[in-house]
Structures are given as structure tokens and as C-alpha cells.
Amino acid sequence: YDAMVAAYQNDFRNGFWHWTSFRFYAILAYMKKYNITQIVHVENDVMIFENIANITFHRPDKLLLTMDNEHRCVPGLMYIPNAHILEQCLFQFDHKQNDMQNWGNVYHIKDQPWIETLPIAPKDSPQKVSPILTNHYEHYNSIFDAASIGQYLGGIDPRNSEQKDTKGFINTHCDFKYHNYDFTWLYEGQNKVPYMKIPSSTGNLQIIKIINLHVHSKNLCQFIFPQHS
């Protein structure tokens, strides 16, 4: 650790892109040491609007992640079944690339047995996108936010822009164009939960739950609402 700090002190944000990959080795060490299985890893700017214990993942034996285009993974939320699978994935990493590129590359290894994707878009919509973005939607009847919804609704990291207000930001890397649709907040029990309004291919309006938001702006408070009495 100390050697990495010294080596990267002059890099972008003190080695930001190196640390984003290093975290997975730290998670691996933790899982091995304490014999931990079936964990959900979330970045600290990700808000989850569902009790994790109530989410039945479609393949509890595989590592599940979000891809926002054919080749890029945004690992803000990831289900990791066990240390063995995580380790096999990390063996494939090219440390000249960042974590988003590496996870995307591992996913695309021919006949790889370790990874499947979580849906970031519904299967039935006006947009035609890769099945990578919609696979297993029917299992959840909900979508996960890789990054673009949180960026659109809440803006981006202020360190990345000179604009004070970046709400409405459109992530051009993401193949699904969320800015074409409306969003609303509905109470589930005492808590408000985000939903996307999107027509089906036949024109019927779908109101689709969003399980998490990747709040890139780091301003999580804007999405914390008073509990419904």
C-alpha cells in the first residue's frame, strides 16, 4: 500500500485509476480471510432503494455487474458470489487499463464462465440496444443504474466540470438514452423510490422501478426525502 501511494502521488488524483482496480484485490483478500461469500459491493456514491436482502439475484453463482455499452462496465454496484470467481476474473486484468475496461474485457472473454450482466434498461422500449444492457430484465422487472441515470438526475462530480449545475448531464458513453424519458418518485411504504416512465414498443406506458442511483455528483442528500407517515 505505501509503495503504491509513493508511486502514484504524481498521477491523476494520486493514482485514481490504479486505486479503482486495487479495491477489488482488497475485497478479494477480505473474502478469503473471513471466508465471506455472496457480497454486494457498492461505491460510496451509490444509493440503493431496495433492501439488498430482498433482491433475489438471477445467478447467485456468478459475478453480476452493469455494462452501459457493449464494452464498458461501470462497477458501481456488483454482486460477487465468492472469492474464487473474483480471483479468476482478476487474473485476467491488464493493469495498463482501468477497471471499467478490464471488467468489460473479462466479460467478453469467449465462453467465460464467471460473469453475467444486470439490466440497465427494459427489453421492451423504443430504443434498440445490445442485449447486454437488457439481459435478465424479466427476472427483476426493474433496472439498475450503471451511472447515467444518476448523472442525468443529479449531475456529475463537480471536480469534472466548471459548471455549477450539471443536472441533465447526458453520458455519451451509455448506449441507452435516458434523457428521452421522464422520471418520477413514488412511495413504497415509508420511502420514496425512483421510477422511469417509458413507452413500450406498442405505445403503452411502462413505469419501471430503478433499484439504485449512481450519484456521480456525490450530493446524495438531494435524493433523501422525508419518510411518509
Name each region found by the language model.
Residues 28-32, 56, 107:
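N-terminal cationic-hydrophobic initiation segments that often serve targeting/anchoring roles
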Residues 1-32:
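Active-site-proximal specificity loops/subdomain of glycosyltransferases
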Residues 46-77:
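Conserved donor-nucleotide/metal-binding helix-loop-beta segment in metal-dependent transferases, i.e.
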Residues 21, 79-80, 97:
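Short aromatic/basic micro-patch
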Residues 87-229:
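Catalytic core and acceptor-binding pocket of nucleotide-sugar-dependent glycosyltransferases
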Residues 36-47:
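Short beta-strand-to-loop acidic/aromatic patch adjacent to the donor-nucleotide binding site
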Residues 73-89:
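Conserved nucleotide-sugar donor-binding
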Residues 34-35, 59, 110:
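A structural signal for short coil/turn segments at secondary-structure junctions
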